[in-house]
Amino acid sequence: MDVLHELDAFVTWQGGFDYYFAHQEEPAVWDQAQSDLRKIGLSAAAELFGVARDLFLSTDHFTEEQAVVNRYLSDMRELNTRWRDYVPALHQALAHWRSERGLEEFGLKGW
């Protein structure tokens, strides 16, 4: 669940998916974040995360073609906007996870 805290911090509160993937460069962490989203019942958010990841990976971030840059930024902004639909449920799940009962559900000792 710690990867979801990082995902929330970068995507929700800082710079969106583009910012997240640029700062968290480990594909294993991306896979864990997507898996954890599914684990907490946010399968649609996990799919959206996958679309954003694929867009990030398939884009030449060093291109000088303005049309490519504009299309990428437009598509990423749309995905960031759609992400907002899942933020309340994500925050609820993260709050539960931080609670004593939530920690115990994950096999960790409560506060």
Could you tell me what each predicted segment is?
Residues M1-W111:
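Extended, alpha-helix-rich binding/interface surfaces that flank or overlap catalytic cores
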